[in-house]
Amino acid sequence: MNFTPTHTPVCRKRTVVSKRGVAVSGPTKRRGMADSLESTPLPSPEDRLAKLHPSKELLEYYQKKMAECEAENEDLLKKLELYKEACEGQHKLECDLQQREEEIAELQKALSDMQVCLFQEREHVLRLYSENDRLRIRELEDKKKIQNLLALVGTDAGEVTYFCKEPPHKVTILQKTIQAVGECEQSESSAFKADPKISKRRPSRERKESSEHYQRDIQTLILQVEALQAQLGEQTKLSREQIEGLIEDRRIHLEEIQVQHQRNQNKIKELTKNLHHTQELLYESTKDFLQLRSENQNKEKSWMLEKDNLMSKIKQYRVQCKKKEDKIGKVLPVMHESHHAQSEYIKSLKDKLVQEKKLSNMYQEQCISLEEELARIREEEGMRREIFKDRTNKMGKRLQIMTKRYEALERRRILEVEGFKTDIKVLRQKLKDLEQMLYKATVNARANQDLALLCEVRDSNRRAHKIQGELKNLKSKVFGLENELRLC
């Protein structure tokens, strides 16, 4: 808004001067004007406004300015509503972003819980393996006792002894080392199955040899079982220690995350509260400014109406003055005495003219100061717009980064689940292959069974160490993935 016109129309005044007033000399006029300026004080603003006599051009100019001010006021109100809508959208985006962060934290917590459950399941599997080993050892001991009793007592001619490999409705968990021993015992016990020719009484020499042979087998099996039990105990102890350490680390990490999350939430709440407060203050200040400007415009409109009324009165007074001048021209001799009064009237009119010029200069200065204030307000509004745009851009970038992190976490979780499934399948296949190899070795090599068993035990120990190394590698990979997730 530019209130200072570049070419402002001049206020026209018609001063009625008699023909005799023109004869006054220049120095006397100047002296009279100076005396009048010193003697008469400046009138009040209401008197000045009442004595203004603007022209039609000036009135049209200010009417045009008032229309421009009204249009600009409407534009500013529309822009203010747009800014309000944009701020509301920004608050909605901030709420959505906060919800996304909470969902990501919940997913991370669920992932850590799943890892803890996985460790617990592994420990349970180890316990089941140990229980299975204990039951198989007990089964072997029972079979040996039965065979010893049969060898000592002997069997009748029509008596037949049967050994069942597996009792019905029994659930077992296969293991690589004990399975080999069980198959060896089954192959040995298959010689004592139902056959009327073989199950008869044998000589005492064969019974002694078989008892010695069984004693050696029992000793080797006991040593093997003790070694495997020691390894299994160490492995379970190590896994328990690792699981306890991981659970403790997870608890500490969760506590730190909760504390940090609470701090961030408090900080976000404070910042959003401050932002809402500043936006409300800005909205109220702009609304007050627009209201004040509309009030000023209404006052200017009322002034314009008063000016129109004054102009109409001035026209009437001019008509009356013309009539009086005509009458005075007819009665010149009588008016000669009023020459001094007319000269004083002219001086007063000149004083009024000087005062009106001063008032016009003062009004122009006020308009310039108002324009400077308006420019300053516009600059502040531009700076606020730039700050608002920067904030919206930053919030959009942050939302994109958080969505990308959420998608990456989902992909990692799916890949980890698939990796665990494939590792379990590979280990099961290796276990089946090892069982088949041991079965073939025990079936084909009967001549030199002791050495073959020791070799197979040595190979099985090596493979067990190899599988333990692979399990350690898998654990290290899981720990690496957990560290990456924590860093993310």
UniProtKB/Swiss-Prot annotation:
Residues 21-48, 192-213 are annotated as: Disordered. The modification Phosphoserine is found at S36. Keywords: Coiled coil, Isopeptide bond, Phosphoprotein, Ubl conjugation. The keyword Transmembrane helix does not apply. There is a cross-link at K51 (Glycyl lysine isopeptide (Lys-Gly) (interchain with G-Cter in SUMO2)). Disulfide bonds: none annotated. Residues 55-118, 208-488 form a coiled coil. The keyword Cytoplasm does not apply. It comes from the Eukaryota. GO terms for cellular component: centrosome; membrane. InterPro entries: CCDC77. This is Coiled-coil domain-containing protein 77. The gene is CCDC77.
